[in-house]
């Protein structure tokens, strides 16, 4: 029981020292920094240029598609690394499992590729124009509305 409290106590002391370090650094920098606000310092700074327009701009959805595909394959590597470190004791069954896992991801990538979601500039469809419809003859005695 005493050893358990000692272990929790050391974790508590470590967390307390971490909080004190962060708060102490923040307070020290706040006390030592000069504070002379003026309109030029309070203006928005963007790479040395005056900000033009709103910061809320619409990004092309393809940026998000590329980012999502990157995250999917990044997570795949996170799952494959532990598997690769203990591959020999797991045997053939583990190899088949990881091949199925990678195959599902590759099928998803192939589907996105074939669908055209990975193309940065999508081609515009070439739809032929239909010739105008000929006017139908009007029966005798029927009135035409113009």
Swiss-Prot record:
Query: Is Transmembrane one of the keywords UniProt gives this record?
Result: yes
Enzyme group, top EC level?
Answer: translocase
Question: E.C. number, please?
Answer: 7.1.1.-
Task: Name the source's superkingdom.
Answer: Bacteria
Reaction(s) catalysed by this chain, per the record, are: a quinone + NADH + 5 H(+)(in) = a quinol + NAD(+) + 4 H(+)(out)
Q: Name one GO cellular component term.
A: NADH dehydrogenase complex
- InterPro entries according to UniProt: NAD(P)H_OxRDtase_bac/plastid, NADH_UbQ/plastoQ_OxRdtase_su3, NDAH_ubi_oxred_su3_sf
What is the membrane topology here?
Multi-pass membrane protein
User: Which Pfam families does the protein's record reference?
Assistant: Oxidored_q4
- Which cell locations does it reside in? Cell inner membrane
Return the protein name: NADH-quinone oxidoreductase subunit A
């Amino acid at each position: 029981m005493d050893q358990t409290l000692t272990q929790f106590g050391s974790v508590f002391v470590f967390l307390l020292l971490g909080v004190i370090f962060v708060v102490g650094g923040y307070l020290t920098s706040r006390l030592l920094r000069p504070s002379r606000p003026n309109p030029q310092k309070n203006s928005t700074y963007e790479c040395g240029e005056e900000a033009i327009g709103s910061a809320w701009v619409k990004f092309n959805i393809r940026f998000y598609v590329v980012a999502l595909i990157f995250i999917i394959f990044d997570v795949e590597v996170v799952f494959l690394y532990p598997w690769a470190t203990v591959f020999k004791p797991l045997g053939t069954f583990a190899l088949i499992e990881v091949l199925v896992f990678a195959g599902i991801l590759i099928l998803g990538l192939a589907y996105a590729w074939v669908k055209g979601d990975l193309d940065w500039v999508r081609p515009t469809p070439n739809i032929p124009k239909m010739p105008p419809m000929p006017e139908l003859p009007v029966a005798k005695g029927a009135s035409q509305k113009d």
